[in-house]
Swiss-Prot record:
Domain of life per record: Eukaryota
Organism lineage: Eukaryota, Fungi, Dikarya, Ascomycota, Taphrinomycotina
Subcellular location: Nucleus
Function: Required for pre-mRNA splicing.
Keyword Manganese: no
Stated name of the protein: Pre-mRNA-splicing factor ini1
């Protein structure tokens, strides 16, 4: 995910023992490169990201988590699985801009064009 969206900020704290979760939409994606091939290493997240309201949530988009998250074999080979907690902290500029555009359209009484997330 961070390869394709450079404005996303990842947590990168020391990972704990909690396994990261993914939602149905993000299922079987590597959290670093978004590939769907050869899941290898289980993703561990830090204790702060695994506590409170973010518990059992998708580490990429924040939706309710369904399945465990895995790094792909290429990210494991490049040792990206040792860089720290891969949970996305901010939304990124494109989703933030979309939120305010949607709010502007609702206040004007119009329907928002395009896909709804």
């Amino acid at each position: 995910m961070s390869k394709h969206h450079p404005d996303l900020v990842l947590c990168r704290r020391q990972p704990g023992i909690t396994v990261g979760k993914l939602c149905e939409r993000c299922d079987e994606k590597c959290p670093i490169c978004d590939s769907h091939v050869r899941p290898t290493t289980l993703v561990r997240i830090c204790d702060e990201c695994a506590f409170g309201s973010s518990q059992d949530r998708c580490i990429i988009c924040g939706a309710p988590g369904v399945s465990d998250c895995y790094y792909c074999s290429e990210c494991t080979r490049m040792e990206y699985d040792r860089d720290g907690c891969p949970r996305v902290i901010n939304l990124g500029s494109s989703r933030t801009d979309w939120f305010y555009e949607r709010k502007k359209f609702k206040n004007a009484g119009k329907e928002m064009p395009g896909a709804t997330y």
